[in-house]
């Protein structure tokens, strides 16, 4: 989605105090800022969910156009081969400050932060307001998301934890619920549930539009994992990855010892094979 983002502006105001955002994603780069969700009000970015240049996840809320409150994880997220699941649950009506914003990653609530701040009780956030909501790029800045996204949900008026959208399998691995049960509310939505569909697939009709670029459907998704090339492993420059790191192109002359390596689904025992299509790049 590096050159692509999605946009929607609600036609009416929903619940700005209580909401939940859930998304599955795979990032392709480290050391750069990736915007997952961005909402802008009155010329200022007032809400952002993103990775910092240090690969920490930041869930930021801004009020009054100056400063802000937010959660910045201690954890660093540098895996470019696996799918992540994030849930951001906000309810500013709660009496306890730490209950007003909660962050879940791969099923676990994050409670240790390098920086933390919580909104005032009953504060109105920008979410579910009649301003632009972007997925995959900042409203106020650039910072595009370079990676894949799948099964994106927003609720209006209801909070959920991660178990509404995922569950642990018999091996203790967090996996997706492809048809989660939740109440979307008036401005809630479900998009990118089946491939690259940005038509709302909840009980509403809160469709998104393509802000720029082209959406590309990939077979690698949160419910159908594919082996991908390792974006961190090229032994020479000029390797260009695309289509969810399932396609690689090398420009110029390839010398002995120059390569890029696969990263996922590489068994060390048993019988297996690799299938690839080799084409001449014009």
Where do the language-model regions lie?
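Short surface loop/edge beta-strand patches of beta-sandwich-type extracellular domains
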Residues: 1-18, 69-78, 138-141, 176-182, ...
């Amino acid at each position: 989605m590096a050159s692509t983002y999605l946009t929607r502006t609600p036609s009416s105001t929903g619940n700005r105090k209580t909401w939940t955002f859930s998304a599955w994603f795979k990032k392709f780069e480290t050391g750069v800022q990736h915007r997952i969700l961005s909402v802008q009000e009155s010329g200022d970015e007032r809400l952002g969910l993103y990775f910092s240049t240090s690969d920490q996840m930041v869930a930021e809320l801004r009020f009054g156009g100056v400063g802000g409150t937010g959660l910045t994880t201690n954890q660093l997220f540098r895996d470019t081969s696996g799918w992540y699941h994030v849930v951001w649950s906000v309810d500013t009506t709660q009496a306890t400050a730490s209950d007003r914003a909660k962050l879940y990653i791969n099923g676990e609530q994050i409670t240790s932060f390098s920086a933390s701040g919580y909104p005032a009780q009953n504060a109105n956030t920008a979410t579910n307001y009649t301003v632009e909501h972007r997925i995959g790029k900042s409203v106020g800045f650039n910072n595009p998301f370079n990676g894949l996204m799948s099964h994106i949900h927003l609720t209006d008026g209801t909070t959920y934890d991660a178990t509404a959208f995922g569950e642990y399998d018999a091996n203790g691995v967090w996996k997706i619920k492809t048809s989660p049960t939740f109440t979307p509310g008036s401005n809630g939505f479900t998009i990118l549930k089946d491939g690259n569909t940005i038509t709302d697939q909840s009980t509403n009709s809160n469709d998104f539009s393509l802000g720029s670029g082209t959406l590309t459907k990939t077979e690698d998704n949160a419910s159908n994992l594919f082996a991908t090339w390792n974006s961190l492993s090229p032994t020479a420059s000029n390797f260009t990855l695309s289509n969810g790191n399932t396609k690689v192109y090398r420009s110029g002359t390839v010398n002995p010892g120059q390569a890029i390596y696969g990263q996922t689904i590489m068994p060390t025992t048993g019988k297996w094979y690799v299938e690839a299509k080799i084409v001449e790049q014009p």
